[in-house]
Regions:
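SAM-dependent transferase fold signal centered on methyltransferase-like domains
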Residues: 1-360
Length: 360
């Protein structure tokens, strides 16, 4: 099991290769990354049999930017019939697993295999259980089968607590009909990814305040309002009337890059289409000057050297906070609902929750 297999957004295979190669070098795991363009997956081939396991144990998955999912294992050719026997034979040296996910890559060809996986899962699950290879125990490794076709599968393992929260890393979020735009799903997914679900009531509570920079028509504002927050929406464009009717939104016609609240707020969110360095500077200012406690900001990516640019900006932000002597947690992920962008989440670790009065 010396191969690490990773899912990603189609077109970002080289970014996954660059990122995982950097972490492998840091962990002294010898090997090389490879991928074909627009296949929605990449591999890291380790030189030593335990390389993939060491790489996964030494790196938190939720700190990776471009991979959506990862698993260590082997590629397996399958016959047209009796695929289960071949899979069971290959699993002789596998540990007992605590859960089973059947996955496909995020391409048109991959999606065509979804129905096959749905039909194949029940008999496979039954056979694995009867063979003593699958029980219901979240503490044990997760068994992941990624089908490239009906005749080829990647048979792998991952720690359920150190891999994607959803199969293929794709959340099943429902678009709320009352939301002004589909961009609302980006912020909802960001909260799922960056904030543990059991902390939502504390960190996304109705007695909080927020600012949405570049808010119109209100896709991200909607998520803040949905949690009961008082929101100051900053945009020269119009906001959805449905949001204004809630009485929770104050709309200010102003420039999102120059606006500052009179008093600190709990949350700042921003999805302005602008050069990534400029949006990154907003994070430095708002967190560094104590204008907010937490922030979610999207960084639009350049056409080339995308991982290198994101890494450069994150390093710059981190160094800036160190120079100020403040403690900030920094997360960054290309979410499923992101396109040519990544989503950053920052949280001040040394600032108390703000009071409720509306901030203007």
């Amino acid at each position: 099991m010396n191969t690490l297999f990773m899912h990603c957004r189609p077109g970002f295979e080289s970014e996954v290769c660059s990122e995982i190669a950097e972490h492998a070098a840091r962990l002294e795991v010898a090997g090389y990354a490879k991928a074909r363009p627009n296949t929605a997956c990449a591999e890291f081939i380790c030189s030593e049999p335990d390389g993939a396991e060491r790489l996964m144990s030494g790196q938190r998955f939720d700190q990776l930017i471009f991979p959506r999912q990862w698993t260590r294992g082997v590629f397996l050719d399958l016959p047209e019939t009796d695929r289960i026997s071949v899979i069971l034979g290959q699993m002789a040296d596998f540990p007992v697993c605590g859960s089973l996910w059947l996955e496909v890559v995020d391409t048109n060809d991959g999606k065509e295999l979804s129905n096959f996986c749905k039909k194949f899962e029940a008999p496979l699950r039954k056979a694995l259980s009867q063979a003593g290879k699958l029980i219901d125990d979240p503490r044990k490794p997760r068994l992941l089968l990624t089908f490239k076709s009906g005749r080829e599968v990647f048979l792998g393992l991952a720690d359920a607590g150190n891999s994607a929260m959803w199969p293929m890393g794709i959340p099943r979020l429902k678009f709320p009909r009352e939301a002004p735009s589909r961009s609302t799903l980006k912020l909802e997914e960001a909260w799922h990814h960056f904030i543990p679900r059991d902390q939502w009531d504390e960190r996304l509570s109705g007695d909080m305040t927020g600012v949405d920079l570049g808010a119109a028509p209100g896709g991200w504002t909607y998520q803040l309002v949905r949690r009961g927050m008082l929101v100051t929406a900053i945009d020269n464009g119009p906001m959805a009337e449905s949001l204004m009717d809630t009485g929770l939104v104050q709309h200010l016609m102003a420039d999102g890059f120059t606006y500052k609240p009179r008093q600190p707020v709990d949350w700042m969110v921003c999805d302005i289409v602008e050069k990534p360095a400029r949006n990154a500077a907003l994070l430095e200012t708002w967190l560094g000057e104590g204008l907010c406690r937490e922030a979610v900001v999207n960084l639009k990516l350049p056409m080339k050297q995308r991982y290198a640019e994101v890494r450069r900006l994150l390093d710059r932000i981190e160094e800036g906070f160190k120079e100020r002597g403040i403690r900030v947690s920094i997360g960054c992920k290309q979410l499923y609902h992101d396109r040519e962008e990544v989503t950053c989440h920052l949280r001040r670790l040394d600032v108390a929750k703000t009071a409720r009065p509306r901030k203007g």
